[in-house]
């Protein structure tokens, strides 16, 4: 009987490109190289994203020869569900195992307007935010575009049982999306495409801790995707304490990049502001935040801190949260308090992590 370690070694040695990593035009190019008509790409995408098959044998309108070529060239990435937890509020957290034994977490959130999925872009994270569980083990590796796509496909398969669909997504899971920029953009284009899962660009949100060069690059992209910044502090000194990345990408420079993005795209930006008891949640912090954001087309999302055992932060009292919100509103800032989801299964903001570690290969 094969051990887990041996299976992982075998997977690493035989791994092929994920077919989920290919955009439609890339599939068409590959088909042309194989002497196949490009319209087959649409048929293949239909099998992958509409029928959501798990093997090539099921693609019955393709020739046996083409199915064999596909099988020899690409894997249909499947994620092994290690754990599936359901919260009292209906939120579902999936712990998925990857081909090399690493694991990631993906969250399905229920809203009145539909089902939203929170996807992961990296195994671990290098950013080192002092309040977040995702960064505790450091960064292991980037996910391929196909591995990010596969998260959405797997969750959609789970929803197929109740004839529901994923209607929106947020890229706010484990990892810094802009540290995996090319795979992130490939994923977004595949998911957005009408031949893919066809989730509208305006129903997708990407969040970053503030990788400034990539913010400028993102401003030039042709997808009208919602954009969020993990801010969490109204000044550089406090932000550097909470988010070490601020030492590399200073707050004044970050604000310049944000203003460029807003002016270039005409789109409103969202600032995520976690409230940490006694750290960044006082009236003076709210006043300073309002001054920082003055003149910026934006929305502030206040996030009460979620419990992480290895971190020392405590939740801001409810009355203080409302006072912080009121202080911002009184100064003309568009602000809401995020509805908490999945807290009881560690699926809320800042709580995601890979709880199953990769076994050492020998």
Curated annotation (Swiss-Prot):
Positions with a binding annotation for [4Fe-4S] cluster: 125, 129, 132
Keywords recorded for this protein, A-Z: 4Fe-4S, Cytoplasm, Disulfide bond, Iron, Iron-sulfur, Metal-binding, Methyltransferase, rRNA processing, S-adenosyl-L-methionine, Transferase, tRNA processing
GO cellular component: cytoplasm
EC number, as in UniProt: 2.1.1.192
Catalytic activity: adenosine(2503) in 23S rRNA + 2 reduced [2Fe-2S]-[ferredoxin] + 2 S-adenosyl-L-methionine = 2-methyladenosine(2503) in 23S rRNA + 5'-deoxyadenosine + L-methionine + 2 oxidized [2Fe-2S]-[ferredoxin] + S-adenosyl-L-homocysteine; adenosine(37) in tRNA + 2 reduced [2Fe-2S]-[ferredoxin] + 2 S-adenosyl-L-methionine = 2-methyladenosine(37) in tRNA + 5'-deoxyadenosine + L-methionine + 2 oxidized [2Fe-2S]-[ferredoxin] + S-adenosyl-L-homocysteine
Gene Ontology process terms (BP): rRNA base methylation; tRNA methylation
Cofactor note: Binds 1 [4Fe-4S] cluster. The cluster is coordinated with 3 cysteines and an exchangeable S-adenosyl-L-methionine.
Annotated localization: Cytoplasm
GO MF annotation: an example: 4 iron, 4 sulfur cluster binding
InterPro entries the record matches: Aldolase_TIM (IPR013785), Methyltransferase_A (IPR040072), RlmN_N (IPR048641), RNA_MTrfase_RlmN (IPR027492), rRNA_lsu_MTrfase_RlmN/Cfr (IPR004383), rSAM (IPR007197)
Enzyme active site: 105, 349
Binding-site positions, S-adenosyl-L-methionine: 175-176, 207, 230-232, 306
Recorded family membership: Belongs to the radical SAM superfamily. RlmN family.
PANTHER family named in the record: 23S RRNA METHYLTRANSFERASE (PTHR30544), RADICAL SAM CORE DOMAIN-CONTAINING PROTEIN (PTHR30544:SF5)
Record-given protein name: Probable dual-specificity RNA methyltransferase RlmN
């Amino acid at each position: 009987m094969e051990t887990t370690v041996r299976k992982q070694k075998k997977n690493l040695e035989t791994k092929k490109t994920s077919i989920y990593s290919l955009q439609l035009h890339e599939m068409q190019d590959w088909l042309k190289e194989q002497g196949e008509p490009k319209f087959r790409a649409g048929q293949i995408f239909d099998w992958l994203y509409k029928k959501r098959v798990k093997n090539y044998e099921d693609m019955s309108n393709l020739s046996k020869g083409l199915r064999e070529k596909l099988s020899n060239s690409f894997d249909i990435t499947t994620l092994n569900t290690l754990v599936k937890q359901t919260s009292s509020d209906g939120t579902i957290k999936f712990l998925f195992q990857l081909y090399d034994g690493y694991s990631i977490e993906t969250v399905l959130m229920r809203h009145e307007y539909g089902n939203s999925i929170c996807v992961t872009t990296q195994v671990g994270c290098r950013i080192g935010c002092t309040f977040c569980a995702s960064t505790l083990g450091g960064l292991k590796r980037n996910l391929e575009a196909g591995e990010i796509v596969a998260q959405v496909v797997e969750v959609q398969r789970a929803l197929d049982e109740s004839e529901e669909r994923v209607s929106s997504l947020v890229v706010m899971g484990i990892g810094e999306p802009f540290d995996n920029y090319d795979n992130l953009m490939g994923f977004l284009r595949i998911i957005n495409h009408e031949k893919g899962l066809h989730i509208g660009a305006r129903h997708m949100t990407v969040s970053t801790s503030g990788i400034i060069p990539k913010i400028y690059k993102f401003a030039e992209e042709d997808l009208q995707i919602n954009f969020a910044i993990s801010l969490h502090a109204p000044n550089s000194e406090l932000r550097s304490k909470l988010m070490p990345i601020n030492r590399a990408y200073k707050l004044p420079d970050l604000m310049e990049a944000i203003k460029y993005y807003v002016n270039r795209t005409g789109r409103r930006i969202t600032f995520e502001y976690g409230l940490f008891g006694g750290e960044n949640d006082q009236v003076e912090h709210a006043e300073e935040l309002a001054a920082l954001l003055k003149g910026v087309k934006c929305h502030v999302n206040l996030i009460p801190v979620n419990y992480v055992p290895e971190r020392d932060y405590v939740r801001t009292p409810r009355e203080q949260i409302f006072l912080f919100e009121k202080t911002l509103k009184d100064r003309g800032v568009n602000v809401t308090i995020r509805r908490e989801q999945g807290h009881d299964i560690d699926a809320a903001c800042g709580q995601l992590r890979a709880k199953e570690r990769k076994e050492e290969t020998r």
